[in-house]
Amino acid sequence: RDLYHALFQYVQRADRIYEIGCGSGIFTHYLLRHFAFRQLFLNDLYRCPLMERYPSQIGDVCEQEIPSNLDLVVSSSVFQWIVPLEELFKKIAAALKQNEFFAFSMFVAGTLWELESFTHQGLPYKTPQQIKEILFRHFDIVEWKENFCTLSFPDCFALLHSLKQTGVNNLQGDFRLTKTSYRKLDESFDGKY
């Protein structure tokens, strides 16, 4: 929602929009309701129902050819997974028309530190400064916002449900939640997360 509000200050109409990582379509629905456009292109690793109605690319955006002559490229909570990020930003810059917009949100260093303290693993998130340095090489930054928020959950199950719904989990793949580890997490939960 913050991304949409920041973006809407600068752009209300964009003929050709490309969304990277449309996922379940939460941000896409904002675009559909509030932006005038001629073409919307969607990208995600997996097919979602919205992809039936718009030109789409299924697969890693780093391996896809980004449509050209774009007026707007958007992405919500995807770029923390992209390596190498600078290569993708170069592709985006080349695909945008001159003086058009690239707007995104992403998770940065410090995300889900509570979960990392329990699992002893986390993703190698970039710092805001590292992201700015990459951006300055390819774009003029019109607006930069950092938003730190803490979500609270009534119990361990609610936390895990939220992680599942958002796809954000901070894990690199070798942590498995077993009955024993769930019990330990539940015992250590005590309102910390």
Please state what every model-predicted region is.
Residues 124-139:
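Short alpha-helix
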Residues 101-128:
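Conserved class I S-adenosyl-L-methionine
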Residues 24, 143-193:
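Conserved Class I S-adenosyl-L-methionine
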Residues 1-15, 26:
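Conserved alpha-helix/loop element of class I SAM-dependent methyltransferases that forms part
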Residues 18-65:
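Class I SAM-dependent methyltransferase SAM/SAH-binding core
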Residues 71-86:
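A short SAM/SAH-binding and catalytic strip from SAM-dependent methyltransferases
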Residues 86-101:
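A short glycine-rich, Lys/Arg-flanked "PGG" loop and its adjoining helix->strand segment in the class I
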